[in-house]
């Protein structure tokens, strides 16, 4: 999945979260859990966009770490809304699934970035040059 596809996917996730929160009942618990979900769910896309503009591999890893945390947190709040009876499974499960997939993508991106960073440090630049045959 390329950067633009993931930007669109995280945006669609945020829009799904917004629609879900707007559909919640107007009681104290729904408001508190809904606000938490709204914050974490919309943060996934914002932090991913920020990660795509990272200034270094370490900056990218840090920002993708936030994406991972926020996506996982979104699954948590959605699950709480479901088990507390404020959200039907048919609505909650797809959002929890997408949050899990976004979490997995973030984890894989972090692992790849760390591996690439360690490989580039392990190979001296001079070793990258191919000697000319004479």
Residue ranges and their predicted role:
Residues 1-134:
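Short, C-terminally biased terminal segments at protein or domain edges
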């Amino acid at each position: 999945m390329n950067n633009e596809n993931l930007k669109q996917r995280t945006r669609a996730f945020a829009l799904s979260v917004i629609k879900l929160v707007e559909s919640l009942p107007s009681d104290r618990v729904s408001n508190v859990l809904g606000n938490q979900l709204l914050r974490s769910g919309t943060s996934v896309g914002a932090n991913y966009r920020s990660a795509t503009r990272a200034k270094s591999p370490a900056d990218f890893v840090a920002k993708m770490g936030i994406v991972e945390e926020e996506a996982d947190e979104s699954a948590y709040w959605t699950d709480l809304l479901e088990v507390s009876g404020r959200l039907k499974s048919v609505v909650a499960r797809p959002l929890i699934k997408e949050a899990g997939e976004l979490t997995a993508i973030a984890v894989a991106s972090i692992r790849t970035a760390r591996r690439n960073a360690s490989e580039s440090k392990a190979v001296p630049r001079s070793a990258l040059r191919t000697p000319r045959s004479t």
